[in-house]
Amino acid sequence: MNEISIIILAAGNGTRMKSNKSKVLHTLCGEPMISHILKKSYEISNDVRIVLSYQFEEVKNSVLSEFKDVKIYKQDTINRPGTAGAAEAALENLNSKKTLVICGDMPLVEVNELKSLCDNTADISLSAFRAKNPFGYGRVVLNQQNVIKIVEQKDANDDEKKIDLCNAGAYCFDTNLLKNIIPLIKNENASREFYLTDAIELALKQGFMVKSVLVDETNFMGINDKFALSIAEEIMQNRIKENLMKNGVIMSLPDTIFIDSRAEFEGECKLEPNVVILGNSFIKNSHIKSGSVIEFSEVCDSDIGPMAHLRPNSKIYKTHIGNFVELKNASLNEVKAGHLSYLGDCEINSGTNIGCGTITCNYDGKKKHKTIIGKNVFIGSDTQLVAPVNVADDTLIAAGSTVTKDTNKGDLVITRGKQINKAGYFYKFFGKNDEK
């Protein structure tokens, strides 16, 4: 038997997001909102269940692509609308001692606060916070510090609307109690929905113990629209960057830097202003200069930028990447590429110098092709390498060349028209200066 099971409620339409995409698939620091919740859930339990409805297949496929073991259920929103109906959908074969019920739109929640809900002897523990502006939240009604009920904003009377103790939306139930009490919940309210919060009052009437656990309002912030999404992302960004800086990463003007929640750093790293790190990028002992973007790539013992762009699947080791250089699916090891180049679908080996304006022409209109450049190659400025092509070790390519054939070790490659100087032709074409 699992000590704790977790049910994540993610069946809502999320109409205030004004999007055809499910609310829980909107990204926060690079990952879908629901992924943040699932990762934290798996730190607590290996029995994690999620209840869906709106955009069911889309959300299901997204979740299962990353979390293979999660159990997915569909809510009957016609006959059993509301949070109690959602939780009810996930009760099948639930046999843990306790069940933690949380919302899928709370990506900032911390694991320690979820654990604190379950670490007591109450039959039901509910999360609550003191709000400066409680409008819109369910109110936690107390009598001599004991929880009596939770009342939703639209169902609250004038006195209840003055209460500042608000429901944070996470609950830990004794599992047997949860299974027995959900069928008793009625939909006698303004929305005609089955509220999970009504389980509190029903449990109290049966003599069960209910406790509220104070939590941080920010951590339990619900994302209901895109403005709230932007606020939550800023909070999460600050957490990510604070943690990285405390672990040795140097950031200049960190408010201008964006770091994906999946990115990893190791060793001595420095990020200058306006740097963007996306996906599961890995940065080790490297200096990322202003305005550079790194996507799903690996950078070790290198300096990048300013204004460089590493697109997905680039692997950079002991390399200098200068300004306005773009890489895509490129592997560079001990290479210098200082200026204004595109290096895509390529492998470049140690000691090679890439001249300004070098391009790997990797796409023929139908397929992508690979360029392989050996060791100690010198590529002059404004060179085009038409893939598929292999440049052997110790090759010298003259500036302005278009390389379409493989080279041999030690070759000089030059492909350009012969230069002709015609004496006096300027004056013939434009006339002499005194005639202008």
From Swiss-Prot:
Residues the entry annotates as binding Mg(2+)? D105, N224
Instruction: Output the superkingdom of the source species.
Output: Bacteria
InterPro entries hit by this protein: Bifunctional_GlmU (IPR005882), GlmU-like (IPR050065), GlmU_C_LbH (IPR038009), Hexapep (IPR001451), MobA-like_NTP_Trfase (IPR025877), Nucleotide-diphossugar_trans (IPR029044), Trimer_LpxA-like_sf (IPR011004)
Region described as N-acetyltransferase: spans on this chain = 248-436
- GO cellular component terms, A-Z: cytoplasm; membrane
Report which reactions are catalysed by this protein: alpha-D-glucosamine 1-phosphate + acetyl-CoA = N-acetyl-alpha-D-glucosamine 1-phosphate + CoA + H(+); N-acetyl-alpha-D-glucosamine 1-phosphate + UTP + H(+) = UDP-N-acetyl-alpha-D-glucosamine + diphosphate
The keyword Repeat is annotated on this UniProt entry: yes
Q: What is its main location?
A: cytoplasm
UniProt cofactor(s)? Mg(2+)
Cite the binding residues for acetyl-CoA.
N362, Y363, S381, A399, R416
In this chain, the stretch annotated as Linker covers 227-247
Can the keyword Acyltransferase be found in this entry's annotation? yes
Q: Where does UDP-N-acetyl-alpha-D-glucosamine bind?
A: 9-12, 23, 75, 82-83, 138, 152, 167, 224, 311, 328, 342, 353
Under the heading NCBIfam families, the entry gives:
glmU, PRK14359.1
Name the family: In the N-terminal section; belongs to the N-acetylglucosamine-1-phosphate uridyltransferase family. In the C-terminal section; belongs to the transferase hexapeptide repeat family.
- Report the function annotation for this chain: Catalyzes the last two sequential reactions in the de novo biosynthetic pathway for UDP-N-acetylglucosamine (UDP-GlcNAc). The C-terminal domain catalyzes the transfer of acetyl group from acetyl coenzyme A to glucosamine-1-phosphate (GlcN-1-P) to produce N-acetylglucosamine-1-phosphate (GlcNAc-1-P), which is converted into UDP-GlcNAc by the transfer of uridine 5-monophosphate (from uridine 5-triphosphate), a reaction catalyzed by the N-terminal domain.
List the PANTHER family hit by this protein, alphabetically.
BIFUNCTIONAL PROTEIN GLMU, NUCLEOTIDYL TRANSFERASE
Q: HAMAP family attached here?
A: GlmU
Quaternary structure note = Homotrimer.
Q: What is this protein called?
A: Bifunctional protein GlmU
Species annotation? Campylobacter fetus subsp. fetus (strain 82-40)
